[in-house]
Amino acid sequence: LGSFQLEPMAVKIVVFSDTHLHRVTEEFESICDHYCRDADRVIHLGDWTSASVWNFLQQYPLEGVSGNMDDMAVRLQLPARQVIRVGGFRIGMTHGYGFYGDLKEALRREFDGVDAILFGHTHRALVEREGGQLFFNPGSVFSGRGSGRSLGILTVGRTLQGEIVRL
């Protein structure tokens, strides 16, 4: 019999951005229950809008950054950008900004040497690899601009993989 090596236990990270909720809705609770209950981490990339969303998501292992539409209670709790380590990977997180040049180049400059850059703001889902980096935007749960409603799932094991879940 041949031998094989099993993939080490992968880490599941649910990624939200641009929820733009003034209060937690039943629909958001249902989405979170479905996708986050077995997640190892939950990341929110800003524009939570209300601190009630931040408070609600703290029932999960939560990381996050603030966005341009967040109220002061959220901005005081969260940085505008941060880098976390998951397994052997460095992951940069920011909300993003109204940038009209080469967005990927601007993000690359902001997060030198990371394996992945997670960002929101555009409400457009994106999963692309370029120059050895993963660029990942989960889109928006409630107001996708042209790309529909979505969230993201990162799977971290031997590799770092991103997937968009259409809602």
Task: Describe each region flagged by the PLM.
Residues 70-112, 142-147:
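Active-site-proximal segments of metal-dependent phosphoesterases and phosphodiesterases across multiple
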Residues 10, 16, 86-87, 109-113, ...:
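Binuclear metal-dependent phosphoesterase catalytic core
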Residues 2-56, 60, 70-80, 88, ...:
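N-terminal active-site segment of His-dependent metallophosphoesterases
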Residues 35-36, 106, 157:
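A generic membrane alpha-helix/interface feature
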Residues 15-17, 41-47, 63-68, 93-95, ...:
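Active-site neighborhood of phospho(di)ester-bond hydrolases with catalytic His/Asp-centered motifs
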Residues 21-24, 49-53, 69-75, 98-103, ...:
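Active-site environment of divalent metal-dependent phosphoester hydrolases
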Residues 60-62, 132-133:
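A short helix->loop->beta-strand "cap" motif at the edges of active sites that frequently abuts
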Residues 38-42, 67-70, 87-91, 116-120, ...:
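Glycine-rich loops and low-complexity Gly/Arg-rich segments
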